[in-house]
Structure formats: C-alpha cells, structure tokens
Regions:
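Conserved active-site alpha-helix within GNAT-family acetyltransferase domains
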Residues: 92, 113-130, 135-139
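Acetyl-CoA-dependent GNAT
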Residues: 7-84, 95-97, 101, 134
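Conserved N-terminal entry element of GNAT/NAT acetyltransferase domains
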Residues: 1-11, 147-156
Length: 156
C-alpha cells in the first residue's frame, strides 16, 4: 500500500461517495446511506466551490479516504477513510495534512457514540469542547485542536 495525498478533482467524487456510503452503512446499518449519496455529492461539491480544501488519500488510483478543511475557520466538515484502508495510518496522514493547512486550529463534530472516531481525534490532540443534538436527535460531540505554542528559547 502506497498512500499519497492528492487534491480533489470532480472525477473522484463517485469513488468518494462509494467510500462514504460503505463506511457509514457499516457504522449505522439502520440508516439508508445509499439514499443519501446525492446529498453527499452535493455537499462535497458545495464545499469545494465555497473555498474549502478537499484532500484525498489515494492508494494508486483508488480513493482511500478524504478530508475537507475550511481554511478560514478550520472547520472539518467531512473526514472518512474507506473500510479497506482503516487502521493503516491513512486517517493520521489526512489529519496531519489538515493541521499543516490550518495550524491556527481545527474544529469538527462527531457522533458522540462513535467511540473509535473520538479516540482517534483525541490521539490527534483534539479535545471535546461541547455537545449538541443533530436534526435526528443524535448526540454530537464538538471537538477542537489547537497547535501547541512554540517552545520557549533558553535565555542567555
């Protein structure tokens, strides 16, 4: 496996949607994510058109994962790694790239019952800053990462 970070191009949207549907369907099998595929495609297109940075993790020609970052606010609207690439460092690679893009800080929300994602974000230095309910009444954790302050230089 050789994963690289690449810029979003519209021709990759179907593969991104495939990864999104398969991962979310596994996490929440009672929800029909295939029926939400068009929403996802519209969402990614709107984010890209509004100035968000959309980055892909690619393994050869395959889309392994993706992250979106609003460079003005640091908001991560979408982050996902496909099932075949989970647990292989792809998410960490995407997050490190997002941190370099927005060293002032990043924010995101995550389903509060998604223990695996929350543990990943905590390992990446994110802290829980609050909680809210989404439109379906599901608890959502709000999380933020701030770049550590520069180390002080020794005084001479």
């Amino acid at each position: 496996m050789t994963v690289a970070i690449a810029a979003f191009t519209p021709d990759r949207l179907p593969a991104m949607a495939d990864r999104w549907v398969e991962a979310w369907a596994k996490a929440y099998p009672a929800i029909d994510f295939a029926a939400r595929r068009a929403w996802f495609c519209d969402r990614i297109t709107a984010l890209a058109e509004s100035g968000a940075t959309v980055l892909l993790a690619t393994d050869g020609e395959e889309v392994a994962g993706f992250v979106t970052v609003d460079p003005a606010t640091g908001w991560i609207d979408q982050m996902l790694v496909g099932l075949a690439h989970q647990g292989q460092g792809v998410a960490a690679m995407l997050m490190e790239t997002a941190k370099r893009l927005r060293p002032a800080g990043l924010t995101l929300d995550v389903n509060a019952d998604n223990a695996r994602a929350i543990a990943f974000y905590r390992r990446q230095g994110f802290a829980t800053t609050g909680q809210r309910l989404n439109d379906q009444g599901r608890a959502i954790a709000l999380m933020a990462w701030r770049s550590p302050p520069p180390a002080e230089r020794p005084r001479s």
